[in-house]
Swiss-Prot record:
Active-site feature positions: H331
Keyword hit for Chaperone: no
UniProt KW keywords: Methyltransferase, S-adenosyl-L-methionine, Transferase
Organism: Dothistroma septosporum (strain NZE10 / CBS 128990) (Red band needle blight fungus)
Protein name: Hps1-dma1 cluster O-methyltransferase
InterPro entries per the UniProt record, alphabetical: COMT-like, O_MeTrfase_dom, SAM-dependent_MTases_sf, WH-like_DNA-bd_sf, WH_DNA-bd_sf
Amino acid sequence: MGGSDHTKTSSQSTLRSLSDEISSLTDVVAGFLESNGHPERSLNSTDSVRLSDAPEDVEAARRRLVTALHEMTLLTMSPFEAVRDILLEVSSLPALHAISHFEIIDHVPLDGEISYAELARKINVPQRRLTRMLRAAMSRSIFQEPRPGYIAHNSLSAAMVHSKWLRYHAASTMENFLPAAPKFVEQIERFGDRETRCTSPAGIAFNTETDCIQYLLSQPKHQQVLVNLMKHTGEISGMGPQHLTEHYDWPKASDQIIVDVGGASGSVSRAIACGVPSVRFVVQDRADAVRQGESETPSELKDRFTFQEYDFFQTQPVKNADVYFLRWILHDWPDEDAVTILRQVALAMGPTSKMLIAERLVLLPGEGDPWDQKIATSMDMFMMAFNGSERTLEHFQSLIENTGEAIEISRVIRRPNGVQYSLIEVARKDSER
């Protein structure tokens, strides 16, 4: 790494030391790109680029470079300017909302340009307002104006062309989270520490006293966004099943069973099945997900897969399975509900059963990669809008203890670099390990 110290913290950083570190890290990243035939990076490019697939040492250097550049920016600005800049970011939200809502991404040619006047006619938006909002987005490096009166894609706006997940994430942020954001304080003042899916900031925003997630899923516009967001989650670097298949010792015998609790259509279980060619799977979820899973499962796996309609707040019908697998389930729910979900699994576990929880582990400030910390705390705000939660390991430990069942964390498999979730294995206290 050219002798650079990648563990340096903000409190130790000075402008000169950061400058030296940035130069060293840039050499590592640029050297990798050049040696592997990547084109010179440019904000004006509209090519699809994924940099997170680099070797682990290069990826670590790249992530540290992003953090060091941010630290350099903060140290170069005055504290007043830095705080003002954070507040000014809010002003870009109306522009991002318009880009998503009016599907402007689709109306700007990927390789070319379009006048503001023609774009305004196409999407039926007043030209002056459209121009002002898009120029606000450009101040955040989204889109570009190659000549006066014309708009074109750049690398950031083109990313939403290439990534369906990013597009649906933008839509969900603007249509589902943004209305809830001003209601966080009101939720605290009205409900205090009462955290249910029916007392959430989003529930206040959408004026519903029911489970707000279920309310949104009942509205066609919101349902389409949420379903497609989940469908394309695999596009996100570090969210795929590779960590599961490479770092956990799954059962392998034909008489062993893995229960995928809330497993949607079973896509993750199918990925696991490729590495354990004999074990059987039971995938449990809502009726529509079960039907989808049955139709998507290839013929060579059908004899090993059972799909079962199941509400995970009710008694678990599969007893003594080898592994009960919960992937990205608990973070959707307040603590009381999460405890109920865990308890239903615990009551079904036999002496040698394991429960495997795949979730993001939130680190304390100053621990780990600042980039990961930013993602984790940001995602926690998204979850808080619906009274869900991203959790620390200690928080998971508390949930497990509160089940009142004789279960405990037996192992934690921390996520490797670039992966966004860890694995928490839970066993019965009287189990043989």
